[in-house]
Amino acid sequence: MNWQLISFFGDSTVLLPSAAALFIVLMLRKTSRLLAWQWSLLFGITGAIVCASKLAFMGWGLGIRELDYTGFSGHSALSALSAAFWPIFLWLLSARFSVGLRKAAVITGYVLAAVVGYSRLVIHAHSVSEVIAGLLLGAAGSALFLVLQKRTPDPESVHISWGGVACLVMVPLILLHSGSKAPTQSLLGQIATAVGPLDKPFTRTDLHKQAW
């Protein structure tokens, strides 16, 4: 199995443009604008927490050596962004169909996020604690969004036009085909050294070298 490809489903190259496309499509309809803002806020908070945890580690060395923890896994979190994105993405795409199909779409989204998280373990990009923390963070954000939608007085507000559906499907497919990974880790490392007290980004190796 191509675990690198599966991991790419949680890469910022795919998730951030796809998230932007989803926000734009929702904003085009007046009835779904509140939905767009609710989702973008929760997705943004999830991403901000992931970035903050990584900056805290790379800039100040704040990690947990016993758990091999260096911050939330962005792939399993942005998949806290896959677990925050894919369940909602698939739920919105299936909004016109039966309740059973919508539930299946959400479950598929969470399963995909979990598989992305597992792929990060297979390719040795994250520890178990980081993947679990990321999945829990992302799942919490998407679950809160879905709970909020149960209270919406207008179920039509979640319906996306067929043109919008086509656009939303094409964006991630094109990005997945590109295979280009976002340099988010190196960018966060540069920011961490700029704002933190360290001369270079703190690493997992540094964490395990610490004497207690």
Indicate residue ranges for each PLM-predicted region:
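Internal alpha-helical transmembrane segments of multi-pass membrane proteins
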Residues: 96-106, 131, 155-166
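Long hydrophobic alpha-helical segments typical of transmembrane helices together
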Residues: 175-212
